[in-house]
């Protein structure tokens, strides 16, 4: 790719190809992931914004706190260069993913926490940077997490903890979320 964001997305495409076993005997396709890549290509941001160091997995579970103040940031294996919105959207999406899981299991979760507009406004007030193209970056976060969840599910199949589904899209734990995002009905 010719920009840090293009390289980032191309890296995710390569990870997807590896995850699905491209070229191997057990190769399969995930239509939901491929539809999301197509959506991202079709809606690519006109202005990607400035390039910064992206944490990659910035979320509450990867921070250490002392007296309610963050003192350490953990889990840097997804670090890269790219727009700030990569981290903003990842934090919002991952919280929403776990919120949806909590509700699915009849738990209240924290529905008023890390809401997209609140996070964007707080980020702007603290940094002076206005988050742009947040819908695009949230879709990209959902895609990235979908590929990670696919790989996690594949390991469960490999170790005999579950069967390989007839529909590979079922490997994506939040498939319904991505479908609703693609339809414009999730947020």
Where do the model's predicted regions map?
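Active-site acidic catalytic loop and adjacent metal/ATP-binding pocket
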Residues: 35-37, 41-86, 92
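Active-site activation/catalytic loop segments of kinase-like enzymes and analogous catalytic loops
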Residues: 86-127, 141-160
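A cross-family kinase active-site recognition segment
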Residues: 1-32, 44, 48-51, 78-82, ...
């Amino acid at each position: 790719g010719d920009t840090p964001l293009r390289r980032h997305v191309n890296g995710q495409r390569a990870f997807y190809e590896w995850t699905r076993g491209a070229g191997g005997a057990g190769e399969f396709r995930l239509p939901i992931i491929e539809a999301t890549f197509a959506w991202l290509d079709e809606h690519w941001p006109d202005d990607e914004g400035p390039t910064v160091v992206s944490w990659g997995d910035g979320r509450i579970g990867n921070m250490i706190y002392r007296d309610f103040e963050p003192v350490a940031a953990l889990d840097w294996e997804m670090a890269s260069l790219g727009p700030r919105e990569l981290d903003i959207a990842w934090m919002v999406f991952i919280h929403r993913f776990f919120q949806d899981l909590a509700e699915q299991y009849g738990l209240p979760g924290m529905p008023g926490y890390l809401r997209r507009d609140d996070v964007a406004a707080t980020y702007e007030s603290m940094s002076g940077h206005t988050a742009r193209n947040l819908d695009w970056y949230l879709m990209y976060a959902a895609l990235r997490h979908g590929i990670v969840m696919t790989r996690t599910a594949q390991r469960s199949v490999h170790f005999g903890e579950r069967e390989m589904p007839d529909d590979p899209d079922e490997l994506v734990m939040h498939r319904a979320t991505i479908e609703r995002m693609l339809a414009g009905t999730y947020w």
